[in-house]
Each structure stands twice: as structure tokens, then as C-alpha cells.
Regions:
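Alpha-helical transmembrane segments in inner-membrane proteins
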Residues: 1-241
Length: 241
């Protein structure tokens, strides 16, 4: 999210959905193109200027793309199309069909390969960038590969589900707290925990009366943000001890 991938995928998907009523295949490739394009823009702006500049560039690109989505929605002539786009933006599994999953599978597989290739980089990064560099890791190349992998995964997912936040942040933290293993050994566990959290959220908005009028993305944000803050504070206290 900080590097603009999710915003890029969202903006391109909204454009294709409203103006072209694009089928799922085109939406998936458009989402990936938007995610990759947004990340590459952030990377080109900041790759010589350090992490802080990259985060600030990502925030700026996110704001710009968010404004683009708002502009597209404000120009929507059909109230039905606007309502459907709003529902999609808030997060829903209505469009996550078997056909969509089949279209997305090659892109998701390529993203997984990128992450798996850089598993050693992710393990060493837990000790800091300096330690990773002294162990022979090419930091810029590894970071670029990981970011491309994430962009592929995000771009192939958002056209099917809309923007559903915090699950991708919470699941790895829970996996690491429970298993206490390095990141490279938590890929599958994190994915399963994330899938379970998404399933619980989907069932809650469908069958729990209190959540009946909100969408999945809204529910995950309401519950996920405080929970993530609690996890971060808990980990900080453990490190302080």
C-alpha cells in the first residue's frame, strides 16, 4: 500500500470497469499493470534517495491515485454503475468467481515465485539492512524483486475483491507470533491465516445482523486497525524487555 501498488490497481480497475465494462481477464491484466506502474513510478522517483524518500513518494502517489478514483466516480453518469463501483471499492467477494481465479492464477504464481526467490533477503532483513548487505544480499535488486512480486499479487487480487485492507498486515504478524519462525517459513501459514480471516469477515457481513449493512473492507478496517496497533505495541514491549 505504501508503495502505491494497491492504489494503482484500484484506479485502473475503476477506469476499465466504468468506461469499458471490461471482462475479468482485462481487469486482471489492467490491475497488474496499474499496480506495477504505480510502484515503478515510486521507485524511479526515490530509488537513489533512501527509504524515507520512497515512503514519502509512495504517500504522494497514493494521494494522487486516490484523487483520480474520486474524480472518476464523481463523473459517473449512471447511479447504478456508481453504486456498483462503490460496493466493489468497499470490498466484496461477489466477483471472485472460479473463472476469475483461473485468469489470475498465472499472475499470482509469478508473484509467489518472486517472493520465494528472495526468501533469504526477507529472513536477513529482520536483522536490519546493514546485516543483510554484509551477508552478500544485493538490497536494491532484492527489494525490487519483492516489490514486483507484491505488485503482481495485489494487481491480480484487487479486480476480484476490491480494496480489503489490514488482512495482509495482520496475518503475517499472527503467524510469526504463533510459530516464531523466520519470514521465509511463514508464507503458507500467513496465506492460510489471511484466507481464514477473509472468510470470517465475509460470513460476518452476510449472517451477523450487526454487520449486515457494511462491507468486508470496512469491517476488516474497523476491527483490523486496533488489533494491528495492539500487536505492534505488544511486540515493542517484548523487545524493550
Amino acid at each position: 500500500g505504501l508503495l502505491g501498488s494497491s492504489s494503482g490497481a484500484t484506479a485502473v480497475s475503476v477506469f476499465l470497469l466504468y468506461y469499458f465494462s471490461a471482462p475479468m481477464g482485462w481487469l486482471l491484466f489492467g490491475g497488474v499493470a496499474g499496480a506495477l506502474g504505480a510502484f515503478l513510478l515510486v521507485w524511479l522517483i526515490s530509488f537513489r534517495h533512501g527509504t524515507t524518500m520512497m515512503i514519502l513518494s509512495g504517500v504522494a502517489v497514493n494521494v494522487l491515485l486516490g484523487a483520480a478514483v474520486t474524480l472518476l466516480l464523481s463523473n459517473a453518469e449512471s447511479p447504478w454503475a456508481l453504486a456498483e463501483l462503490y460496493r466493489w471499492l468497499q470490498g466484496s467477494l461477489v466477483w471472485a468467481t472460479a473463472e476469475a481465479v483461473c485468469w489470475a492464477f498465472p499472475l499470482i504464481l509469478l508473484g509467489i515465485v518472486c517472493l520465494y526467490r528472495e526468501r533469504r533477503y526477507l529472513d536477513l532483513l529482520t536483522f536490519g539492512e546493514e546485516t543483510a548487505a554484509t551477508m552478500g544480499i544485493n538490497l536494491q535488486r532484492s527489494f525490487f524483486t519483492v516489490s514486483i512480486g507484491v505488485a503482481l499479487l495485489v494487481g491480480a487480487t484487487i479486480p476480484q475483491t476490491g480494496t480489503i485492507g489490514f488482512i495482509g498486515l495482520i496475518a503475517p504478524h499472527l503467524a510469526r507470533i504463533w510459530l516464531k519462525k523466520p519470514p521465509s517459513q511463514l508464507y503458507l501459514t500467513s496465506a492460510l491465516i489471511g484466507a481464514l480471516l477473509l472468510l470470517i469477515a465475509d460470513l460476518a457481513v452476510q449472517y451477523v445482523p450487526f454487520f449486515a449493512r457494511i462491507y468486508i473492507g470496512t469491517l476488516t478496517a474497523i476491527l483490523g486497525a486496533p488489533f494491528l496497533i495492539w500487536i505492534l505495541f505488544t511486540q515493542q514491549r517484548r523487545l524493550a524487555q
